[in-house]
């Protein structure tokens, strides 16, 4: 009989592997638990049978689980190359428990501090947080190329209780700048499978990830300056915070001249010189720059390459908001701004290294 109770077919992270349980994929929407039990009953005695259903619509999700009394039933199912149920080919496999997902750390002695001003030093950070309790270590993450810190770092306190007190205040003021403080998390928590690493995004000039409020992604290489109470050596940090990776792509110039649609706008409309020059370009078939013709008076030139026209102050979201850009990024870039130059600020994607932490997370 179908059941609306919570379905135990999906194993909990700590469930041991049951060699008698099978995952059945590719089920027809019409397949019932009775039909599933009847089909697999020919291979052995079925102990448990489940068709997984949506808790709201009660519609089949297209897969289920079958547990045999002994492993011989599983072997017989696997020995048969093709299985068909309710006029649909199904895919039975041995079921394995889901791998445990890393859990967020709730008790820790280490905090992440982000949004520091460029003139803030590690001594400034340590001095500020000493008002909450004893600071064991403080560090800022540096770009080894420019030898300037990236605006964030970590502080380790003597006890977890001090961290709780610090994190009760989400934003702190250090050197006349509001900085963000949160509990540091292990790398496995902050960089799960399928993170945004490698996704191309463009950062507006003069803006960093803290201004955008974007989630943070682990940097491949940072070096850290640490407070003198303890030295850190080695690579591979135990903690990491997520920043998007950034790159600017420049569209190549087309090799052939780009001419307007001849039937729409006659070349003679632009004057004899323009018509002659365009005709000469067609004959030569070469040139380092494409020919472009101005649109008729009163029309608005289309924007190309995702950049604004030189006289349009439009919103930043239109400037950098490509169709495949994350909505989480574009939602923060909405203020009107004059069209920028092609120069960009310093890149966050340079060669960086990070030091290891010594509290068991690496």
UniProtKB/Swiss-Prot annotation:
SMART domains per record: RRM
Domain RRM: 20-110, 109-186
Keyword Phosphoprotein set for record: yes
Keywords: Acetylation, Cytoplasm, Nucleus, Phosphoprotein, Repeat, RNA-binding
The keyword Cell division is annotated on this UniProt entry: no
Family annotation (SUPFAM superfamilies): RNA-binding domain, RBD
GO BP annotations listed: epithelial cell differentiation; response to hormone
Residues recorded with modification Phosphoserine: 191
Assigned protein family: Belongs to the Musashi family.
Chain's role: RNA binding protein that regulates the expression of target mRNAs at the translation level. Regulates expression of the NOTCH1 antagonist NUMB. Binds RNA containing the sequence 5'-GUUAGUUAGUUAGUU-3' and other sequences containing the pattern 5'-[GA]U(1-3)AGU-3'. May play a role in the proliferation and maintenance of stem cells in the central nervous system.
PANTHER family per record: RNA-BINDING PROTEIN MUSASHI HOMOLOG 1, RNA-BINDING PROTEIN MUSASHI HOMOLOG RBP6
UniProt-recorded name of the protein: RNA-binding protein Musashi homolog 1
Organism: Mus musculus
Lineage of source species: Eukaryota, Metazoa, Chordata, Craniata, Vertebrata
